[in-house]
A protein has these predicted regions:
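A short, surface-exposed loop/turn module that caps and links secondary-structure elements
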Residues: 36-62
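Enriched for short, Lys/Arg-rich terminal
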Residues: 2-7, 12-29, 47, 61-68, ...
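PIN-domain endoribonuclease scaffold, especially VapC-family toxins
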Residues: 28-36
Length: 89
């Protein structure tokens, strides 16, 4: 059964998301696909090689080789922490 969840962005993640919308529509669409997949499959299953972060709270999924979608989920809310760059940078 599909979860009904809300999606919230941190300020930084929102600006990154809008930057993708403006500069690279393909990446923007990939991020949206990953968010839909999280809603369908939960935190650790589905597209983008989902994994739990080792040294901080949250999860990541690959957008591409250089960029990760970093997020956590609490009380049926996906909180997007970052959608540009890599969590190790």
């Amino acid at each position: 059964m599909k979860m009904k969840i809300d999606i919230l962005f941190t300020n930084t993640a929102w600006y990154e998301y809008l930057e993708w919308l403006e500069k690279d529509k393909i990446m923007y669409k990939k991020i949206n696909e990953l968010l839909k997949d999280i809603e369908r499959n939960g935190t650790l299953h589905g597209k983008g090689k989902p994994e739990k972060l080792k040294y901080r709270k949250g999860y990541s999924r690959r957008i591409d080789e250089k960029n990760r979608l970093i997020y956590d989920i609490e009380n049926d809310v996906i909180r997007v922490l970052s959608c540009k760059g890599h969590y190790e940078e």
